[in-house]
Curated annotation (Swiss-Prot):
It is a peripheral membrane protein. Residues 7-248 form the ABC transporter domain. This is Phosphate import ATP-binding protein PstB. Part of the ABC transporter complex PstSACB involved in phosphate import. Responsible for energy coupling to the transport system. It catalyses: phosphate(out) + ATP + H2O = ADP + 2 phosphate(in) + H(+). The gene is pstB. It comes from Carboxydothermus hydrogenoformans (strain ATCC BAA-161 / DSM 6008 / Z-2901). Its EC number is 7.3.2.1. The complex is composed of two ATP-binding proteins (PstB), two transmembrane proteins (PstC and PstA) and a solute-binding protein (PstS). Gene3D superfamilies: P-loop containing nucleotide triphosphate hydrolases (3.40.50.300). The keyword Lipid biosynthesis does not apply. Belongs to the ABC transporter superfamily. Phosphate importer (TC 3.A.1.7) family.
Length: 253
């Protein structure tokens, strides 16, 4: 249904100087689904992910054409509030990157930046966010100890909690488990399945099995182009394009 489309991308082109990194991308991202972006290194999937919260704005020489509609509003229109966009679209990066602060201060950081000073409200947000990231029970007795003392998997869940603290509508994840061991990876994957009940999730992954396990839809990128996008089971069992089949069966990439 049209009303279920959270993000509508149309005719998106992105250039780094004279180099075209994304070529005429059009796709829909649906509410409360996990959309996986797959493809070999350098195919444009992470670049595309960063267009969804305008992170590419920070790179000198970037030029973007086309439109990205978030709930029907073009996020690239003139005078669009980028700060508000990044409040609605949280991001989790490849390697866990906790701030050199306590567990509590990591999660409370963004609400404070946005002007929240009430200690009781901050306490509520910290607990709610840590529970949302399935981390509360593991850290509730060490909230004021350095976040760097957590394991890698715990640090990544802390980064997810930090993203949840501003109550976003969309979560972008750029290979969130690539630096983690198998058990920590499994916990993050289970968490993603839980999170999609409340959030729309877009995840970049190099792991074909992971994309098959956790996503509802999969988009295959190659050389800056969107080759095809469909329900994940279709992409992995009956892809329309030979290049998609060659990639997911390991013939290249």
């Amino acid at each position: 249904m049209l009303s279920d489309v959270k993000i509508k991308v149309r005719d998106l082109n992105l250039y780094y100087g004279n180099f075209q990194a994304l070529k005429n991308i059009s796709l829909d991202i649906y509410k409360n689904e996990v959309t996986a972006l797959i493809g070999p290194s350098g195919c444009g999937k992470s670049t595309f992910l960063r267009t969804l919260n305008r992170m590419n704005d920070l790179i000198p020489g970037v030029r973007i054409e086309g439109s990205i509609l978030f709930d029907g509003v073009d996020i690239y229109k003139e005078n669009f509030d980028v700060v508000e966009l990044r409040k609605r679209v949280g991001m989790v990066f490849q390697s866990p990157n906790p701030f050199p602060k306590s567990v509590y201060e990591n999660v409370a950081y963004a609400p404070k930046i946005h002007g929240l000073k009430d200690k009781r409200k901050l306490d509520e947000i910290v607990e709610k966010s840590l529970r949302g990231a399935a981390l509360w029970d593991e850290v509730k007795d060490r909230l004021h100890k350095p976040a760097t003392g957590l394991s890698g998997g715990q640090q990544q869940r802390l980064c997810i909690a930090r993203a949840l603290a501003i109550e976003p509508e969309v979560l972008l994840m750029d290979e969130p488990t690539s630096a983690l061991d198998p058990i920590s990876t499994m916990r993050i994957e289970e968490l993603i399945q839980e999170l999609k009940k409340k959030y729309t999730i877009v995840i970049v992954t190099h792991n074909m099995q992971q994309a098959a396990r956790i996503s509802d839809r999969t988009a295959f990128f190659l050389n800056g182009e969107l080759i095809e996008m469909d329900r994940t089971e279709v992409i992995f069992t009956k892809p329309r394009d030979r290049r998609t089949e060659d990639y997911i069966t390991g013939r290249f990439g």
